[in-house]
UniProtKB/Swiss-Prot annotation:
Its EC number is 6.1.1.21. Gene3D superfamilies: Anticodon-binding domain (3.40.50.800), Bira Bifunctional Protein, Domain 2 (3.30.930.10). One of its GO terms (biological process) is histidyl-tRNA aminoacylation. NCBIfam families: hisS. CDD domains: HisRS-like_core (cd00773), HisRS_anticodon (cd00859). It catalyses: tRNA(His) + L-histidine + ATP = L-histidyl-tRNA(His) + AMP + diphosphate + H(+). Keywords: Aminoacyl-tRNA synthetase, ATP-binding, Cytoplasm, Ligase, Nucleotide-binding, Protein biosynthesis. One of its GO terms (cellular component) is cytoplasm. This is Histidine--tRNA ligase. The gene is hisS.
Amino acid sequence: MAKNIQAIRGMNDYLPGETAIWQRIEGTLKNVLGSYGYSEIRLPIVEQTPLFKRAIGEVTDVVEKEMYTFEDRNGDSLTLRPEGTAGCVRAGIEHGLLYNQEQRLWYIGPMFRHERPQKGRYRQFHQLGAEVFGLQGPDIDAELIMLTARWWRALGIAEHVSLELNSIGSLEARANYRDALVAFLEQHQETLDEDCKRRMYTNPLRVLDSKNPDVQALLNDAPVLGDYLDDDSREHFAGLCKLLDAAGIAYTVNQRLVRGLDYYNRTVFEWVTNSLGSQGTVCAGGRYDGLVEQLGGRATPAVGFAMGLERLVLLVQAVNPEFIASPVVDIYLVAAGAQTQSAAMTLAERLRDEMPGVKLMTNHGGGNFKKQFARADKWGARIALVLGESEVADGTVVVKDLRSGEQTAVAQDSVAAHLRTLLG
C-alpha cells in the first residue's frame, strides 16, 4: 500500500464544518469594511525577496528566520509573503494608485512564516489587512481603530478585547531613543539573554518585546520612548487620543508597545485578549509614512493594520459560540420514491429562484423517511419539505418544522411565502 501524503506541519486543511464558521466571520468583517468605503485589492502570494527585505528590515526576525524563500528556474529569489502591507504598497506604486490620491484598501488571504506551530499561530496563516494611503492626520488613525471596534461589537467579542496604544515618533526621535536605550542596555548586559544581546545593536527596540521575566524587570528602569517624541508626533498622538475619547473607545497607553516591522512610525496599536489563555494579539497596526518612498514611490502618508483570522476564529468560538452556530442548510427536501425525484429537483430550483440566499439541500441517494430525516438533522436543517407521489399529484408539499415538529400541507405555488414566514 502506498504511503499516505499528509499536509505540511503548520499548514492546515479547513474542512466544511470549519469553513462555514470562517465564511460567517469573514462576511461580517467584509460588510463593515464596505460600510466605511474600503475596496478590496487582490495581491500575489509570491513576491520578489528584496521587497520584504527593504520593507520589513533585514535585521528583523521575520526576514532573518521566518521567510519561505527560494530561487526559481531563472535564478530569481522569491518569497512567499509573510505579511500583506509590503505587497499592497508595491501594487499601489506599480499601478499608480498612490501619489496625490486617497486610497482605502483591504485584502485577505494566506501568509507564510516558518515559526514553531502552536494554537492560533501556524506556518500558513490567514490575515485580513486594511491600508489607507494619502491621509496623514490622526483622524484616519482613529477611523481605523473605530472600524475594528465595530468588528468586535458585530462579532459579540467587544468585552474580551482591549486596545493598547503608543506613539513611536519620527525616525529622528526614534534614533535618539535608540541611542539612549542601547546605552542603558550596555550597562546591564549581564541581565540580557543571548537573543537580547544580539538585538541590542541590530534592532534594540525589539528588546522591549522580550518575554524573559528578568529582562522585563530590567526594562522597568529603562528610558521611555515617550520622553523622546518630537513635537509633531506628540501633537498627533494627543489628537488621536482625543478622538478616541470622544468616540467612547477605551484604551491603555503602553509605552513599551513597538511593532515587529521596521517601517512603522508615530501611531502603533494592538487589540489584545486574555480569553485564549495567555495574552495574545488579535489585531495590530500603525502608521508607516516612509514606506512608500522607501519602496521607490513618492512620499505618501499611510496607515493600516492586519488581523490574524485563526486567532479571531478561536476567540469567537471561545466567547460567543452562538454567533457561529448557524446551520449548514435551512431547508432539506425529502423525496419519497424515485418517481418524485424529478418533481423534487424542479421544486428546489424554483424555491432557489424565489428565495435568493436560502440554503436548500435536496436528498439524493434514496433512503426511507427515517434515513432522510436523519440526514436533515445531520445538516442542521430547520425545515423539511416532504414530497411524495400524492403531493406531486395534487400540487402540494408537506412543510415540517423540525424544531417544533408541526407540519402542514401547502400548495407548491405559495410555499415560498410560507417558508419566509417560518424562517423569519
